[in-house]
Amino acid sequence: YVINLSVKLAIVMLLFVINLRFMIPNGENTAIKSDLNILFVIDKSVSMKALDYNGSEERFEGVVNDSCSIVDELSGCKFSIITFGDEAQRVIPFTTDSDMVQAELKSIALEDDYYAGGSSMNLARDTLEKTLKEESKRQNGNAKFVVFFLSDGEITKEGETLETFSDIKQYVTNGAVLGYGTSTGGKMVSSLYTDTPDSPNYYINYYDDNYNRVTAISKLDEKNLKQI
């Protein structure tokens, strides 16, 4: 479901309390030594460019900010990242190197709207299931996985509907679906723009059935996020 930042942080602190093993002071910060595996599943599709986060910022700014906050709060756990759009891939294996994880989060590039083939959350589902199965086996079935799924819920791959995630829950100890965007939606700046915001080519656009140029608007899909 869609939740604001304060609730997101409350969830993080709940996980912190439930799964804390012991803590070791580490300079100014306190590191958590834990058997938790934190897995981010991050939407990097074109719609995450929509300018309706925190007023008029890019949705993906929210994703990066919240993910980095989670890494800070759960420093000492193991982290891994899956990204998805028109394809899905695991970009880093599980690691306790928080600095590397945050650097990777900040370096994720959104898809180019000129080449993008439509976003698919089913690809994310398949990659997530594969990762959880492999890591569970590698860690002899003793691993605890916390999954954070960060997306606007929008599926743009033609003819696709969301598949069930229910058969994955056997591998997941806890987690949250974090939603980004609004029901009214937002415009997306084109990766090909060369002009100013008042130019018709600045934002992603398309031609409707009557061959009229229309500015594309991406809207949050709460139904898909709630289903996950």
Positions of predicted regions on the chain:
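Acidic, polar low-complexity linker/tail segments
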Residues: Y1-L39, S45-Y53
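DG-centered beta-turn motif at the end of beta-strands
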Residues: L15, D43-S45, I81, L128, ...
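Von Willebrand factor
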Residues: F22-I24, Q89-A143, G181-M188
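…and closely analogous acidic/polar surface helices at protein-protein or active-site interfaces
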Residues: E28-L36, S47-F79, T95-T96
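Second-shell loop/turn segments in exported
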Residues: M48-F60, C68-S69, D86-V91, I108-G118, ...
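Extracytoplasmic/secreted envelope proteins and their assembly/folding machinery
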Residues: F60, V64-C68, S98, Q102, ...
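Loop/turn elements at helix/coil->beta-strand transitions in domains of secreted/extracellular proteins
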Residues: S75-F79, A143-K144, Y171-G175
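VWA/integrin I-like adhesion module and closely mimicked acidic/polar interface patches used
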Residues: G153-K226
